[in-house]
Amino acid sequence: MHSFTRKLFLYHTALFAGGFGAITVEARTPTGTVSLAYIARLYSMKTKLFGKKVLMENKYNKVEIETNSRRAYINGVMVWLHAPCRKHGNEWTIREVDFKGSMDPILRTYAYAPKRMPRLVVLDPGHGGRDTGSISPKGYKEKEIVLNISYKVKKLLEAKGIRVKMTRTGDTYPNLDVRSTYAYKVGADLFVSIHANAAGASSASGVETFITASSGYDSTNMYGQDQDTFAFKNNTYDAMNSVLGFSIHSNLVKMSKRDDRGLRRARYSVLKHTRCPSVLVECGFLTNPHEESLLNSPSYRELVARGIANGVLGYFTLIKRSLR
Ligand SMILES: [Zn+2]
C-alpha cells in the first residue's frame, strides 16, 4: 500500500465509520482526490456515462458530474466544484474537498449538522446609503430592491416563529466589517446577504448563490486568476455553508423560475469573516431587460423572498431531523 493510499484509506474509514460502517475499499487515486466509482459505491448509486456527464443515482438522490468541467448537479441543481472532474487512469475523480465539504454534507446532512437548533437568522440587505449597489438602465437601485426583498423574507420567517435581525433596516450603509461583526455580536446562527446582479452583457440572466471558497482553492468567479486562497474564520463552516447554500439556492431557482447559475464560491468579505454558516444570494440581473422589470415588480420580489425563506426553513428542518 503506497503511503498516499494508506492516508486516503484511513480518512475514508474515519469519515464513514458512522454512516456507512467500516469501509475497506482502497481508492487508487492521487492524494486529495476521490473517484466517482468510489462515491457511487458508498451511496449505493448506479453509475453510467451519458455524453459528457457521469450520472450517479439511487432511490433518493441523483448526482451528475460533467467530465473535465467544474459543473455538477445534485438533484438537478447546479453546484460548482472547486476543480474540474478529471480522469486518472480509468477513474473519473473529483477533489476530496468537493466531496467532503460539499456533496456529502448536502446528501448526508445528519452527519455534519450542529447539535442544537439554530435560533437567530441575520439578513443582510446589500449596500445602502451612499452605496447604491447596481443601478438598472431605468434607474432602479439595487439597495432599495434588496431591502424590500429582505423585509419580505423577514416577515415570512417570523410567521414561522423564527427570530430575524437585519444588518440595516433603512437607507444606511453599515460597512462590510460592521455587518459580520453585527452578526457575531447578536449571536447569529446563520447569515444571508441579499443582492441583485449586474453584468456588462445585457444577455446575462438568472440567479446564483455564493458561499466561501475552501482554503487553497480559487473563487469560482475568479477561477485561475491571482488571488488569496487562505483559510478564513468562516471556513470552519464549510460543510454547513454547503447545506445552507444548497437549500437556499435550490428553493430560489424553483420559486424564481430563473436560469440556474449555480451554487458558487467566493471570498466576499461578508461571507469569509462571518462566524456562522453564511450565504450570499443574487436575485437576478438589473442589466437584463426582463429581469430588470421582474426585480421592480412586487410579485417577483415576493417569489424570490419565498425562495430564500423556504431555503432557510429547509435548513432548519434538516437540522431538526438530524437531532432526532
Ligand atoms: Zn450587490
Model feature map: region roles:
Residues M1-S3, R28, R41, M45, ...:
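Solvent-exposed, well-ordered amphipathic alpha-helical segments
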